[in-house]
């Protein structure tokens, strides 16, 4: 919670700090923050964006490979051109070269015993008949249940009273179905089913149009299109369109004083105070724990912030000399019940002659992988890739390098990604809108607050648009 001593110390240093003013201060220069700032500036209001990092982009971060040929996304990496209209508009605006996700060929699955089998993309894995029938039943049940929820205001106390694991058990899910659903939560949120409210997870699915659409690699799905230049293209483009001086990098916010008595909010950052009429914060909820608020946030917001959790979620990009998996008839998509990678996807860039498998390390197997030495991490993934694609004899010869970034060590993402989760009991007791509702002169954006495509870039952009509309309306009336 907000520490009054810390707050007093922050405020006491105000007399030594330099100051300036703006109509609106936006905290965070990711997609939500930059979108909000763009819209505020378009309305002829002055704006300052305070970003803790030394770069823009937030959880979109693209890096060139060491040889200068090809780019990998350490963070968010997919969009689509059907129902992610706002981020797709940015792709067109900034001349993104789009790469369609490969779904031609077989997928591979690794079962709980380590056995490997393959199946065509879009079909169920090659389980026995009873297991296959139950996986389809549980999948369709989750799809149907998530579709009954209101996207912005889900309300089901029964679903929120239990974990997603308990929900599955109450529906008689088989061992194979439980393992399949665990792959979903690990790949989507880096968490185990036991740690997530059933209501929260199902609403998360609904925010992306449903479980099937959110997990799909085909048109309209959550993983349909990549950008050759990398997804940070959008944030860099938005930043380049801002007037000079709007974005302040390396400026972490330490305190927000909404109790000045003069109608202005004071935002404290590194020896400087910025006074504003309105503040839009777009940082992840775990980061809000590190900001002192005066007065403190309302109980509903404070409880939500203290309740959110990240699991373990990291992408490891394995670069190879050739797309040997394609030559063997695979599309590159795999799932595993045991890990280390729960899901693998082909993220190659043919135009750059770069052949890449992105391994998603999430949840319990992710934590185990993180505890390994760098050499053992690499070897464990090479072994798994060799097994999944029947390439144990060539995988090490084909291997070039591993590229990764551990968001769990990133202070300004809140020590995790892609999106926080909630345990049972929070949504129903606080109300689904508690986090995004304005309070005093503070407005809340970021992909966590989104109704549609929560946890995705589309959700971030839409949340920034919403927050901008809120402040513009209040400042213009």
Q: Language-model segments: what does each one mean?
A:
Residues 113-120, 192-195, 254, 260-265, ...:
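Charged, often glycine-rich, active-site loop that binds/positions anionic groups
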Residues 251-252, 257-328:
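Central helical "cap/lid" subdomain
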Residues 12-145:
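N-terminal glycine-rich phosphate/pyrophosphate-binding loop and immediately adjacent elements
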């Amino acid at each position: 919670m907000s520490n009054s001593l810390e707050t007093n110390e922050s405020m006491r240093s105000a007399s030594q700090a330099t100051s300036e003013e703006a109509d609106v201060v936006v905290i965070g220069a990711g997609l939500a923050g930059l979108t909000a700032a763009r819209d505020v500036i378009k309305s002829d209001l002055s704006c300052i964006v305070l970003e803790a990092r030394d770069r823009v982009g937030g959880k979109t971060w693209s890096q060139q490979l060491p040889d200068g040929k090809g780019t990998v996304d350490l963070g968010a990496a997919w969009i689509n051109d059907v129902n992610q209209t706002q981020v797709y508009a940015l792709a067109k605006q900034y001349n993104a070269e789009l790469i369609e996700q490969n779904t031609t060929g077989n997928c591979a699955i690794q079962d709980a015993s380590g056995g490997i089998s393959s199946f065509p993309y879009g079909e169920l894995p090659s389980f026995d008949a009873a297991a296959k029938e139950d996986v389809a039943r549980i999948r369709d049940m989750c799809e149907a249940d998530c579709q009954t929820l209101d996207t912005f205001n889900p309300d089901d106390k029964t679903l929120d009273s239990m974990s997603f694991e308990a929900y599955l058990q109450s529906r008689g899910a088989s061992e194979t179905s439980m393992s399949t659903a665990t792959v979903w939560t690990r790949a989507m949120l880096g968490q185990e089913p036991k740690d997530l409210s059933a209501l929260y997870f199902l609403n998360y699915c609904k925010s992306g149009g449903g479980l099937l659409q959110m997990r799909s690699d085909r048109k309209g799905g959550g993983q349909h299109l990549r950008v050759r230049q990398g997804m940070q293209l959008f944030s860099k483009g938005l930043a380049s369109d801002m007037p000079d001086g709007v974005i302040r990098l390396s400026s972490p916010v330490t305190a927000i004083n909404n109790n000045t008595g003069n109608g202005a909010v004071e935002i404290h950052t590194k020896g400087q105070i910025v006074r504003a009429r309105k503040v839009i914060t777009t940082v992840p909820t775990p980061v809000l724990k590190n900001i002192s608020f005066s007065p403190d946030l309302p109980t509903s917001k404070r409880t939500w912030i203290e309740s959110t959790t990240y699991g373990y979620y990291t992408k490891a990009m394995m670069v190879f000399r050739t797309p040997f998996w394609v030559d063997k008839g695979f599309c590159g998509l795999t799932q595993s019940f045991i890990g280390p990678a729960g899901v693998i996807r082909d993220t190659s860039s043919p135009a750059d002659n770069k052949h890449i498998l992105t391994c998603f390390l999430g949840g319990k197997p992710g934590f185990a992988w993180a505890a390994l030495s760098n050499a053992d991490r690499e070897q464990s993934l090479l072994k798994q890739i060799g097994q999944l694609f029947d390439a144990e004899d060539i995988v090490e010869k084909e291997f070039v390098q591993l590229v990764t970034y551990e968001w769990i060590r990133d202070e300004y993402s809140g020590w995790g990604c892609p999106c926080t989760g909630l345990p049972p009991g929070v949504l129903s007791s606080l109300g689904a809108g508690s986090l995004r509702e304005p309070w005093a002169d503070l407005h809340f954006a970021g992909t966590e607050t989104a109704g549609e495509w929560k946890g995705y870039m589309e959700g971030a952009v839409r949340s920034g648009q919403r927050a901008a509309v809120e402040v513009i309306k209040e400042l213009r009336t």
